[in-house]
Structures are given as structure tokens and as C-alpha cells.
């Protein structure tokens, strides 16, 4: 997302003449590499600030006016939430999730209906480009980016060598997606993806995310108490969706787990692997 903002900023001399991603982090003004399509979809990370309590659903229909987003449809689906989850067991079993693990992960699970109010309210869709860019580029965030690059210099060296992806782009994604781990979200990924798999207008898409989240826990890559993130189920400092985690996450520190939440090495390398597999070309330049 930050890469898109930086590229768009190049076209506006009033706001960002000669804008370049490396200048944010004190590096030479040339960014190499292109990625197609851009990523969709965040050692130790700074402690996250306290988050406000999760609000209740407003009871209003979704802004999209989709038939599955009417207030009546949302209530009906919420009433059938447990039945919907039970119907997903055969799909989970095919992915290697045990019955015990499945039951444990859905035990007592209730839908987070507040998500229905958030589905069409993401800031990139509700703010102007420049207001949104102002949120992404600040002196504090730039300083934090430089600190991250210095703190993990050896890891960035190794990842650049292994994947050919520019460290400054990885650091920028880390900064945009979670402000360097300080804003990773505190919602249960299991609860969020289960809610969206059974309620609302994107059930087919989020069914895959929910099942993939169950697989992540079954493999032991991420601790259950660490699998927290955004209302949409993105988690970790560079905000992997569960299906993206399955495709791109790597165990770069060699501990047998692909932990993009707690391991800086896994986080940096997995983000680089995502870009590489999505078409990053080291020899190309832009900006």
C-alpha cells in the first residue's frame, strides 16, 4: 500500500516533487524493483498502545447495500453462526485440522458483529489521497523506520541476498501496515475470520481465511494468543492474511516455525518472499 502511495505521489509536484521511498530512511535516492501485483494485504516489537473496547454492532445495514448486508440478513446469519461453523468441520478436516483442535478453537465462539459496520469503512476508501498519505508519512514513523533498519541490519543484509528485495521497501511496508508493530490489532483472527466466513457479503473469501487460520494454529507456527490482528484477520507487523501467510511465510531463523509475529527474521524474510513471488524484479527501477 505504501508503495502505491509513493508512486502516486511522484505525479504531484505540489505535494511530492521527486518523492522517493529511500529518502524517508536516509538512503540514496534510487528505489529498485517493481512488484506486480502489489501486496494485498505488517526480534521483538514495541508494545502496542491500549486499544479502545470493541464496540457493538450499530444494527444498521452495511454501506454496500448488498443483500447479505441488510440488518435482517445479518441478524439471521448471526443466529445461525454456530450451525455455519459446524458445517465447516469437513473442510477443516481435509486440511489436516484434528477434531479436537477444531472444537477447541470454536468453543464458545460468538460473532463479532461490529465488523459489519467496518466492512466498507477502511481509511483508504474514506479519506482523500493526501489525507491518507499524511497518516502514513510522519517524522516519528520515519525515525522508527531508520531505527528498525539499524536494529535488524544483519537480517536485512541476509534477506536482501536471499530474495533480492530492497530492505527500504520491506521497512516501509512494516511501517505502513502496523507503524513498526505498535498497531497490529487486538482482535482474535479466529473470531474475525469466522464471523466474516458466516455473515456478510464476502463469506466465500473469508471461509478460506478462517480455514487457513485454523491450519496456522494446528501447525504451531504462531501461538494462539499471538494470532490477533485487524477486524479482517490480518496479523503480525506486516499484516499477513492467513491465506497469504500459507503462501509466503518462511522460517528464516531456522527454529521450525514460521512466526511472522514474534520473529523479526521470519517477518522480514516472509515479507520479502511475498514481494518476490508476486513479481518483484530487482533490476528494475521506478521513481
PLM regions and their residue ranges:
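Bacterial N-terminal signal peptides
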Residues: 1-9
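Sec/Tat signal peptide C-region and signal peptidase I cleavage site
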Residues: 10-16
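Compositionally biased, proline/threonine/alanine/serine-rich low-complexity intrinsically disordered stretches
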Residues: 16-83, 100-103
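Catalytic glycan-binding domains that act on GlcNAc-containing polysaccharides
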Residues: 97-287
Amino acid at each position: 500500500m505504501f508503495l502505491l502511495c509513493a508512486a502516486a505521489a511522484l505525479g504531484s509536484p505540489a505535494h511530492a516533487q521527486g518523492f522517493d521511498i529511500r529518502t524517508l530512511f536516509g538512503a540514496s535516492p534510487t528505489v529498485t524493483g517493481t512488484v506486480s501485483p502489489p501486496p494485498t494485504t505488517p526480534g521483538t516489537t514495541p508494545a502496542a498502545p491500549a486499544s479502545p473496547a470493541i464496540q457493538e454492532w450499530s444494527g444498521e445495514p452495511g454501506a454496500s447495500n448488498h443483500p447479505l448486508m441488510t440488518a435482517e440478513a445479518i441478524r439471521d446469519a448471526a443466529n445461525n453462526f454456530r450451525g455455519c461453523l459446524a458445517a465447516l468441520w469437513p473442510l477443516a478436516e481435509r486440511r489436516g485440522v484434528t477434531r479436537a483442535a477444531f472444537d477447541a478453537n470454536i468453543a464458545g465462539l460468538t460473532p463479532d458483529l461490529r465488523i459489519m459496520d467496518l466492512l466498507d469503512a477502511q481509511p483508504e476508501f474514506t479519506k482523500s489521497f493526501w489525507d491518507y498519505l499524511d497518516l502514513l508519512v510522519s517524522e516519528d514513523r520515519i525515525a522508527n523506520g531508520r531505527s528498525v533498519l539499524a536494529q535488524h541490519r544483519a537480517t536485512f543484509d541476509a534477506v536482501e541476498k536471499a530474495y533480492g528485495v530492497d530492505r527500504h521497501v520491506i521497512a516501509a511496508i512494516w511501517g505502513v501496515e502496523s507503524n513498526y508493530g505498535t498497531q497490529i490489532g487486538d482482535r482474535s483472527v479466529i473470531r474475525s475470520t469466522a464471523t466474516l466466513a458466516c455473515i456478510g457479503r464476502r463469506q466465500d473469501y473469508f471461509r478460506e481465511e478462517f480455514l487457513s487460520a485454523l491450519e496456522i494454529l494446528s501447525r504451531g507456527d504462531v501461538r494462539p494468543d499471538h494470532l490477533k490482528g485487524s477486524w479482517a484477520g490480518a496479523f503480525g507487523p506486516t499484516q499477513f492474511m492467513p491465506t497469504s501467510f500459507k503462501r509466503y511465510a518462511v522460517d528464516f531463523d531456522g527454529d521450525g516455525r514460521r512466526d511472522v509475529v514474534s520473529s523479526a527474521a521470519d517477518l522480514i524474510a516472509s515479507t520479502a518472499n511475498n514481494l518476490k513471488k508476486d513479481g518483484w524484479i530487482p533490476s528494475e527501477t521506478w521513481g
